Regions:
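Short, active-site-adjacent cap segments at secondary-structure transitions
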Residues: 130, 162-165, 231-233
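Bacterial Sec-dependent N-terminal signal peptides
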Residues: 1-28, 32-33
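Short glycine-rich anion-binding loops that position phosphate/pyrophosphate groups of nucleotides
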Residues: 77, 127-130, 161, 203
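N-terminal beta1-alpha1 cap of cysteine-dependent amidohydrolase-like domains
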Residues: 34-121, 125
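Class I SAM-dependent methyltransferase SAM-binding "motif I" and its flanking Rossmann-like core
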Residues: 82, 134-135, 141-204
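Patatin-like phospholipase A catalytic core
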Residues: 47-49, 230-231, 235-246
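A residue-level signal for conserved active-site and pocket-lining positions in enzyme catalytic cores
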Residues: 69, 122, 159, 198, ...
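Conserved anion/nucleotide-ligand pocket segment
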Residues: 189-194, 198-235
Length: 246
């Protein structure tokens, strides 16, 4: 075979292989991205964030420092004791996060949507679980958070902010007074972002008796109890309980 013909044949074959490799590479990238968008939720759930903030810093794959967190303190606004709210903020600042507070009873849905969309992660503080869910549904924040978590935005929940992710929050009656702040609230459907029921503050003062009663009365549910020193970390479909039990 003449030299020029062999050279031409080599160029054609090389081009075909190069195109095939390029298409295969792009196919893998698209498939991975599509799957990631569907399933890669990132959720960090705890009872007392100030006690487990270090766990978050060690388990996230991307650095937190310099990111902005949408901080929702709404569950606490009618509570007598709220020190945990400031403790949570201080723990976030210690991780290098910038806080954008959004008390959802003071904003309309469009404003809340913009803040949640602009921030890098979402933090929902503790307080009354039923009041929090009532205001989530009233403002549309429940749907906004489900949308953001579905897109892979990191969600950090503390206490009530943890329990609202369950399929239903009626089991929280053992811990929170649902009649005092929400006398007309009777839709106990949770966000349903998770398919289990976290029992926060398990065997932790002053909720020792309340959490034990939940374990006894709701043994038919897939409960996951966590103490103040533990956290539930979810990546996609993988779930891990981290930290030490008290």
């Amino acid at each position: 075979m003449k030299l020029w013909l062999r050279t031409l044949l080599w160029i054609v074959i090389s081009f075909i292989f190069a195109q095939a490799a390029y298409c295969k590479r792009n196919e893998k990238i698209q498939l991975y991205s599509s799957k990631q968008n569907r399933t890669m939720k990132r959720v960090f759930l705890c009872s007392s964030f100030a006690d487990v903030a270090e766990i978050l810093s060690k388990t996230t794959s991307s650095p937190l420092r310099g990111n902005t967190v949408a901080f929702i303190p709404t569950a606490s606004i009618h509570e007598a004791y709220t020190q945990y709210v400031e403790d949570g903020k201080n723990a976030l600042r210690a991780l290098g996060l910038r806080i954008k507070e959004v008390e959802i009873t003071q904003y309309d849905k469009d404003k809340i949507a913009k803040i949640l969309g602009d921030c890098d992660c979402i933090y929902v503080s503790g307080g009354n679980t039923f009041f929090l869910m009532q205001e989530f549904k009233k403002t549309g924040t429940d749907l906004l958070i489900k949308e953001q978590v579905g897109r892979g935005k990191l969600y950090i929940g503390e206490s009530a902010g943890t329990m609202i992710l369950a399929p239903n929050i009626e089991y929280a009656k053992k811990m929170d007074n649902h009649l005092m702040q929400t006398p007309n609230f009777n839709d106990f459907t949770g966000l349903g972002i998770i398919d289990f029921y976290p029992v926060v503050h398990f065997n932790s003062f002053p909720f020792i008796e309340a959490t034990q009663n939940i374990i006894k009365e709701y043994s038919n549910l897939p409960l996951k109890p966590i103490s103040n020193q533990q956290a539930i970390f979810i990546i996609g479909e993988d779930i891990a309980i981290l930290g030490k039990n008290e």
